[in-house]
Amino acid sequence: MRGATCTSLNGRRKGHIMSEIKKSLSAVMLDRRQAIVLGLGGMGALALAGCGGSGSSSSSSDSSSSGSGSEQSSYKVAMIMSGIITDGGWDQGHYESLKRALESHPKWEMLEPKENTADADAATAAQTYVDQDVDLIIGNGNQFASDWAEVVADAADSHPKVHFLITNTDPTTEMTDYETLDPVETVLPDFKQTGALAGVVAGLMTKTKSIGFIGGMKLPSTLTKYSAYLAAAQKIDPSIQGQYNFEAGFTDASLGTNLTQQWITLNNVDVMWGDASAVDNGARQALEAAGADTHFDIAQPIDIVGDDQPTVVTSTVTDWMIGQAMDEVESGSFGGGKAITGNMDNGGISLGKFSDRVSKDVQDKVKEYSEQIKAGTFITDDEVSTIQKSL
């Protein structure tokens, strides 16, 4: 089904920071912020790899889990991130999800987000909001799961109205060192659906039968996204091949430019999808230089189609389900370590608008295939797994 063998840039993978009481439990994959802090250590070995990632608020809700039973008239929400709200990717996507949630939740007030939060400062940043009795503290990524265990445990006793929402985190594997998950929930998007949506667009838009993907780091979510991306594209045309790199980091646009330029030259890539924030901006520069009429980009995780992005034909959009978390805080049902799933059924995963470079015929086919992706019938788990095992 793959049509080609794959090789990838080999990079180091660092384990999550675990608490002292359970360091021996397991080692898990490096998180997004650690990749940013460590920089692009493998950048000099620019290896190319060929082959072929809201509800409405209640008008009469309880005062969350404080147990008072009285109606709360206002709520505060705060966001902590490793990057900035204008990164064009990960943190901007979270920030826009929060703004959308606020539009339908008039009782809520957003405090100033904490940007560029270093690993050493993550717990302190959260504690600052705990001390203000902020109702919902959002951590943009699984790195915060490894940093907040002690803060959460203390807050559960001393600030029972404070709740924590950590995105891109599986509580069953990434929060085993927590003393309590009572005030915690996480969000997990359907990465298979995201990748498949990008894959059908790539499969329908490519003329050279060669598509590319850049990931910031080799996370399980990144591997699932790429595997579904290639599987869906090959469902359109089994001869399509994929080029990938999972070690690009999230900050160096020039690396994205260089990778994409080489893939265009050596592998004739004409469609790209990325999961690497600023690096994706560099990839788009290379596509534009090669010709925006023939080289296309699928953006992620926000909708950026417009005149200032001539290569972007559509976007895979992730909503981080913050509105649902707000509803649960208001009703008193938030917590217990539940994982909120974002998918095509609840608006957590979607495609953005199309550029005028996408024909009506292609748009109609994308719509048809999207319904199959939503129903789980377009690609199988086995097809995705077969590709993922080869990476």
How would you describe each model-predicted region?
Residues 1-51:
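N-terminal secretory signal peptides
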